[in-house]
Amino acid sequence: MKVSTAFLCLLLTVSAFSAQVLAHPGIPSACCFRVTNKKISFQRLKSYKIITSSKCPQTAIVFEIKPDKMICADPKKKWVQDAKKYLDQISQTTKP
């Protein structure tokens, strides 16, 4: 009985701490720990986001690809820069 009570208290403490950490505004919502080396077809790309937080281990571009998947890429790679330009052009032509 004492072990289960102690475990329950520990679980509640951890969950309360996790909620505070996740709600903290200074912590980025996403970080890339690895980047892909594969070039992604531009037709599969939906959008991108630049991750530059000092709390993340590296700067990266996160591409949202079809169907609803996120891929991290190295912003220094030429294909990544070309993909960003492609998405920027598409978003400009679709805006009224």
Swiss-Prot record:
Source domain of life: Eukaryota
Subcellular location: Secreted
SS bond partners: 31-56, 32-72
Tissue-wise expression: Lung.
Family label: Belongs to the intercrine beta (chemokine CC) family.
Role this protein plays: In response to the presence of allergens, this protein directly promotes the accumulation of eosinophils (a prominent feature of allergic inflammatory reactions), but not lymphocytes, macrophages or neutrophils. Binds to CCR3.
UniProt-recorded name of the protein: Eotaxin
